Amino acid sequence: MIEIIQEYWRALLWTDGYRFTGVAITLWLLILSVVMGGILALFLAIGRVSSNKFIRFPIWLFTYVFRGTPLYVQLLVFYSGMYTLEIVKGTELLNAFFRSGLNCTVLALTLNTCAYTTEIFAGAIRSVPHGEIEAARAYGFSSVKMYRCIILPSALRIALPAYSNEVILMLHSTALAFTATVPDLLKIARDINSATYQPFTAFGIAAVLYLIISYALISLFRKAEKRWLKHMKPSSTH
């Protein structure tokens, strides 16, 4: 094991000498997908709770499709399927985009987490105490101001525990990136196994690194929950 770590630690952590690899790529995939998917989900969640069915239905359909199909299949559709379409082949921008395994992986991860996060945020919006909304209306808040100052801040705090689980799941989902030949942590572990024929060591090292990242994320979310959800915990009585 020591020999493998000494030889491959750089590739496992950030580079093989030619490109970024390993943990660096895994974190990059996670950050890109979570940030872009989260921002998009925030707007879709507002539409998801809309009383207008023409706004609500397309968003429901989007979340149904991406939550109802495996992420692995979605990645294969983007990476292997899209490039076979004539419209993609004939459009320079689309051609260049779907030719990249990294682009396809980020797209699949972003849309997948967006679908789940939309439902998390929508559920949190529905859970905002009605009294807060009525008070905002009584003060003459417009719909935009009410969402910006009252509903979204409360909803995001309510959604934090469920959203933290989604982020951890997305970290695990980045392991599918090797399917698109993206040199993430699992891809490097597979390459080490192919070179050394020591699968327990190769994948064991990868597992330890995933655990370290997961622990760091869980710790960050716990600190956030203690800070922003403290007022929501019942006070102790003596």
Kindly label every feature range from the protein language model.
Residues 1-238:
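Transmembrane alpha-helices and adjacent helix-loop boundaries
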